[in-house]
Each structure stands twice: as structure tokens, then as C-alpha cells.
């Protein structure tokens, strides 16, 4: 079990769910990515989150452009939805405590 600071608490209906994040995905979309293209990107992220949740994994938004996830495959899937020429995406492996 991870330390308390490394465990993210997620509120879902009346049930408390705890996850241990393994990967941190940070993205910085260019201002060139606008309107309908942004909407498509966020819809893809929601679809990835839903698919992961159905398999017992969770992806959490921590800040506007920061996501925590439990699997490498989820992190790579998230990174692949962004237009790489106009978005800077970084994936970090969580090895210690995360404090926000």
C-alpha cells in the first residue's frame, strides 16, 4: 500500500474509492487547438476514462492539464489523443509522494 500522500481519494456517489496513481500525464495544448478540436480531444479522454473504469482502473483529473492514472497503457492512450505538433505531453512515473 502506498503512503497516504500517494493515495488519491475519489468521491463517486456514496462510495469512497481509493486509487494508487502510477503515472502522471501532463499536457500543454497550444492556443492553436481551438473549439471543435478541443471538444473532440476531451470526448476521447472521457471515453478512455470510462473504458478504464469499466476494467477497474481509474484516471483522475488533478488540475486542468494534469491526469493521474493507474496503468501505463492508460497513460499512453491519453497521450495519443493530442495533436503532437501543437501539444506538449509529458508522462511521469510516480515513484514517491504526490502533494497538491
Functional labels for PLM-detected ranges:
Residues 1-5, 40-45, 65-68:
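Short linear motifs at secondary-structure transitions and domain/linker junctions
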Residues 1-20:
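N-terminal, charge-rich interaction modules
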Residues 2-3, 96-100:
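Short acidic DE-rich linear segments
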Residues 15-33:
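Short glycine-/aliphatic-rich beta-strand segments at the starts of folded cytosolic domains
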Residues 30-53:
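Short amphipathic alpha-helix segments
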Residues 49-91, 98-100:
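Short, intrinsically disordered low-complexity segments
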Amino acid at each position: 500500500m502506498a503512503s497516504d500522500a500517494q493515495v488519491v481519494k475519489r468521491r463517486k456517489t456514496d462510495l469512497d474509492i481509493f486509487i494508487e496513481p502510477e503515472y502522471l500525464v501532463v499536457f500543454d495544448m497550444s492556443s492553436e487547438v481551438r473549439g471543435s478540436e478541443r471538444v473532440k480531444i476531451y470526448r476521447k479522454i472521457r471515453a478512455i476514462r470510462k473504458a478504464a473504469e469499466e476494467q477497474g482502473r481509474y484516471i483522475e483529473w488533478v488540475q486542468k492539464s494534469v491526469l493521474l492514472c493507474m496503468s501505463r497503457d492508460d497513460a499512453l492512450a491519453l497521450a495519443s489523443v493530442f495533436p503532437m505538433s501543437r501539444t506538449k505531453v509529458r508522462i511521469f512515473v510516480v515513484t514517491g509522494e504526490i502533494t497538491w
